Amino acid sequence: MYLKKISLFNFKNFSDTSFNFEHKINCFVGKNGVGKTNVLDAIYHLSFGKSYFNTLAVQNIKHDEDFFVIDGEFDKQERSENILCSLKKGQKKILKRNGKIYEKFSDHLGFIPLVIISPTDADLIREGSETRRKFIDSVISQLDNQYLQGLILYQKVLSQRNALLKYFAVNRIFETGTLDIYNEQLNDLGQSIFEKRKQFLNDFIPIFNSFYQNISNSAETVQLEYESQLEKQDLLSLLQENINKDRSLQYTSVGVHKDDLSFNIAHYPIKKFGSQGQQKSFLIALKLAQFEFVKKQSGEKPILLFDDIFDKLDETRVEKIVAMVNNDDFGQLFISDTHSQRTENIVKMTHQSYKIFNL
């Protein structure tokens, strides 16, 4: 599978621009602010139906315009596939496959497998547990729609339970009947989510470790571990034991919405003890492991986006990454970089067909 062509209309800084791509390596080079990352984000839209960078979709519309359109032509298993994503101010975003509108964006998830590696991935280290849970969920959801639907339902029931706890506090009442129903629903949904996350990480962590050791040339050891309250106790028991605490807080304090991943180097938090190069290597290994996991599970090579990833990496680590993507295990690769000569030197090392777009 590969992206043959993309057309952008009023998307971020592009008014009306098209790119025709090589099936292996495509590079966007130029100064900061010319739109390199915007092209990668447009490609990301075609896979996920949303931006990787902007939570507000309307911010992706070009200034002084009222809509954007991203139109992509793919070759997938020797069939031509057209994916179109568009948004008009004040209206719902539209996602189409071959002219047919998706009723639910979740039905499209996984059809165009894709992995992005970007400087914003540093949020996985810097930010709170929600960011790391989203990473787990995004990987599993690409491959398991049932998991995604369970996750959506869990969040809905969780919101209802939290609203009930607030209602109890405001009205100074308490009754267990409705709460017990929500507890049972959360338990069933939460246990399923926990089991799938645990199974995913059992498979994922060895792949991650292998990539990190390769990138770092085994210079240091790292640890990636799953942390969940459900490791020691079922969710129903936890909910029942913490009811007084939840009533006081007016929200649900236990459940899979509190799960986390710990990132360590030599058994110390990488956030505090890892250098910039080590942190970047950790995140790249994490995303390459995502690529490998999705490829194995889906049977397709995901499109891989490298957004300005070579800064703060020494030459040895860059060469290791290039060597890894320079084999048949990887498919189409998109690279953005501010240094055109560095980019050309890197892609020449691969001996693959490539195209460089100077923006």
UniProtKB/Swiss-Prot annotation:
Keywords: ATP-binding, Cytoplasm, DNA damage, DNA repair, DNA replication, DNA-binding, Nucleotide-binding, SOS response. It comes from the Bacteria. It is found in: Cytoplasm. ATP binds at G30, K31, N32, G33, V34, G35, K36, T37. It holds the Pfam family SMC_N. GO terms for molecular function: ATP binding; ATP hydrolysis activity; single-stranded DNA binding. SMART domains: AAA. GO terms for cellular component: cytoplasm. InterPro entries: AAA+_ATPase, DNA-binding_RecF, DNA-binding_RecF_CS, P-loop_NTPase, RecF/RecN/SMC_N, RecF_2. Its main location: cytoplasm. One of its GO terms (biological process) is DNA synthesis involved in DNA repair. The RecF protein is involved in DNA metabolism; it is required for DNA replication and normal SOS inducibility. RecF binds preferentially to single-stranded, linear DNA. It also seems to bind ATP. Belongs to the RecF family. This is DNA replication and repair protein RecF. It comes from Flavobacterium psychrophilum (strain ATCC 49511 / DSM 21280 / CIP 103535 / JIP02/86).
